[in-house]
Amino acid sequence: MATVVTFLVVIVGWIFSLCLHEFSHALVAYYGGDTSVRDKGYLTFNPLKYTHPVYSILLPMIFLLLGGIGLPGGAVYIETWRLRSKRWESAVSLAGPAANLVLAVVLAIVLHFAPVSASGVWPGLAFLGLLQIMAMVLNLVPLPPFDGYRVVAPFLNPEVRGRIDQASNIIMLVVFFLLWYVQVVNNIFWSVVEWIAVQLGIPLSLAVMGLTQFQFWRR
């Protein structure tokens, strides 16, 4: 029963966090001048409005189910030419990872004051908090197609930016390959994630328990 509860908590919570991530992009874009996000339904918090069949569903679920890694995967199309400045464009990109951090902090506070136990809810929430940190760290990588790149991209030479954007898909595959198969890169990634989790007060032992219960098919 605990396994089922954990699985549902993580899946539902992860979908909510994807919506929050993309909603945050859209909200900042709206205040930055791109009112088209309202017409596109991005301010409704409707999961269907943020859906891309590959980036929103397929890749995130594969990474989550096979590797327990929180891959951010929404799809909000911002009309950047409407934004008031390059700084607003950077702020829009930062809004998503910031939302993941805020949710991680909220979950850490809940876990701190709640009667934490090994039942399905609490390990699920702890693992969900860890997923938020993973998503934030991964999304801040300053390479396309991650938000970290979108933060600095407005200030790049247009020709340089164009060439980098053309190689976006290849760069993404290289990043995932390094993260998955190169031990040094994997260790650095997890060290950063764990350090942030400890600073926020997310119990790592409970999060690991949540991961184990979530991936029940590996037992």
Q: Would you name each region that the model predicts?
A:
Residues 1-219:
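Hydrophobic transmembrane alpha-helices and their immediate loop junctions
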